[in-house]
Amino acid sequence: MPVLHNRISNQKLKEKMLAETQERQTLSFYKYFALDNPSMFRDKLYTQWNQLSVFGRVYIAKEGINAQISVPIDHYNDFKASLFNAHPALDQIRLNTALEDNGRSFWVLRMKVRQRIVADGIEDETFNPAHTGQYLKAHEVNEMIKDPDALFVDMRNHYEYEVGHFKNAIKVPSDTFREQLPMAVDMLKEDKEKKMVLYCTGGIRCEKASAYLLHHGFKNVYHVEGGIIEYVRTAKKKDLPLHFIGKNFVFDERMGERVSEEVIAHCHQCEQFCDTHVNCHNSACHLLFIQCAICSEKFSGCCSAICQEELELSPEEQRLRRSARGNKIKIFNKSKDVLETIMNKSIIDQGNKEG
């Protein structure tokens, strides 16, 4: 019986990936379709893709598949054959290739069976996910931009919106998609008759969100086909005006793809223009935040003086401090508000020391 999961440490896998000389293609895809036996489907795909040295993150559920992966160029055709033949619903499925790609997006294949391919928190049994809004292609998106009766709604997390978005798009400020859905309905409830243009990274979230808004009585709901990735690729290919500014945030080692030259975000520590996402170097924190090169040097890659101080302790001292702290300080959050709270506490503590 073959081993259908990884048994090697992340560090060794990452080192192995960085030492690779073969070229890779980063891509993403999703498909909503009925799947009777997700576990069996998962094991079949894992066996095939592991042999092809595919890396990445794949979620499989009774409602379909959602994947962000990297594939060796030499195995790309074999991978496509495997995917297209895996299920009739996946034949010739659109693959969103990365806008910027250094081939270092993933270093291990993780394939999981889940209840949903995107965590939506929807428990209403009358909800029909197949009743979705109308697709918009790139040129149609640009026409809709001109329509004063159309509202563009960003169906991504707030930290994704922060570094890049469609001009004048509405931000639904949340950390998760499940929080965002009811929040969007509440925020937009006075505009149910207007045209709602939903978008996300690759299309999976805005497709389900379009069905959710229709379920809640919105009349004219659209979503960008293929998400930001397909819109940008098509607009550049056809020399169309590009109305997305900044970076497209991605959930892999790259953390972002440059779309336009504008830098619209700010360093969370000094407020200088910056759109580089990093994780705090203190492994007990690992906060996702925006940090410029100057602050990275000043804080040793940490989100605050607290984490910087902890990082400089011996491993045993770090363990004791974390044990004493317990779960009282919540720092595992992608929210700038949480970061500001940590930084303010650092300033207060420093002031007390100086006093």
Swiss-Prot record:
GO terms for biological process: tRNA modification. It is an enzyme of class 1 (oxidoreductase). Its EC number is 1.14.-.-. InterPro entries: Rhodanese-like_dom, Rhodanese-like_dom_sf, Rhodanese_C, TrhO, TRHO_N. The keyword tRNA processing applies. Keywords: Oxidoreductase, tRNA processing. GO terms for molecular function: oxidoreductase activity, acting on paired donors, with incorporation or reduction of molecular oxygen. It comes from the Bacteria. This is tRNA uridine(34) hydroxylase. It comes from Hamiltonella defensa subsp. Acyrthosiphon pisum (strain 5AT).
